[in-house]
Amino acid sequence: MEFQKCLDATEPVPYSKIIAIVKKELGGAARVNEEFQYIDPQPLASASVAQVHRAKLRTGDDVVIKVRKPGVEGTLQADLGFLYVASRLLEILQPELGRTSFAAIVSDVRTAMLDELDFRKEADNIEKFTEFLGRAGIADAVAPQVYERLSSERLLVMERFNGVPLTDLDGIRGYSSNPEATLITALNTWSMSVMMAESFHADVHAGNLLVLEDGRVGFIDFGIVGRIPQNVWASLRDLSNGFISNNYRLMASSLVKMGAADGEVNIDAFAFDIERVMERLGSMEAQLDTSAVIDEDTGRVSYGTSVNVDQEAITRLLLDIVGVAENNGLKLPREFGMLIKQALYFDRYTRLLAPDLDPLRDDRVTLPNGDGRTDVVAR
């Protein structure tokens, strides 16, 4: 299933326009013919920003090419610029909205989206993640090799992974005899990168985590990454301890330390609001989908099982957490939201692949402790 879910589906750009961009980025048709045996005209994936195609190099390497769609940068610049101006006007006209800081949020989104347009930054993110894997001695996880000599701001040529998404139960069983161990590998790799790498993968939805044919976990699509400031770590550690013990007051006080408060925060009231949100988290369940597949040659019907992780529900829950903080007079760091959203994804994967696993108490799970090391935290 390779890169099929690395991007959200949108209307693809005609291949003639895609190959024209490839030729321009590589210096002409002669260079393209020199480097590539073929490029599949049919897109593997298409999103608002980029389109992905299978290809094979003259060396025999199977690759994918990620091409920025024409006109995307100008459209995004204009739309996000207008949105920023509108948010500033809204804050001026309604000062009570200043606590939410719409303009700051829009500015962060604008920066992140424009960063995604420059594939050189994504290539750099992949390189740094690969270096982290080497330093940490992690052999069971991998990121795709980037072909730098063939890549540019608008073109990214990467190793092609063959595997299945982390939510494809039947597919995982074909590549791994122990899905729970595979999940732990993915979780450990990601959580260690939060502390030990220069940045962490900030978009770990199932399409970006693959179980490869050799059983390794493949991380793809590094367009969005996050970084946690050192001064936030102590608060995160207390937040984790509060979560483990269902101590909502400790969770509330740690969030107060982490965020910028308008004034005195009522810890007890804040803790009550957090408890309501945590009850919603406990009620969220991943849905199992079973589908029939007909073999065209034999006519035999087989059934496959996968998990449907409601990304919209995860986003809504994250917004509820941020909203509760803001209603209690807090502005949480942007990185906190990015981190929590990834943790919510892993919570869903755990409920499906390893329902008996408690990541916060299981000694097989490695958690960052905030001082540059990783170990068991308050278990």
Set out the residue ranges of the language-model regions.
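Catalytic-loop of the protein kinase fold
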Residues: 199-206
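Broad phosphate/nucleotide-binding scaffolds in NTP-utilizing and phosphate-metabolizing enzymes
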Residues: 1-193, 198, 210-379
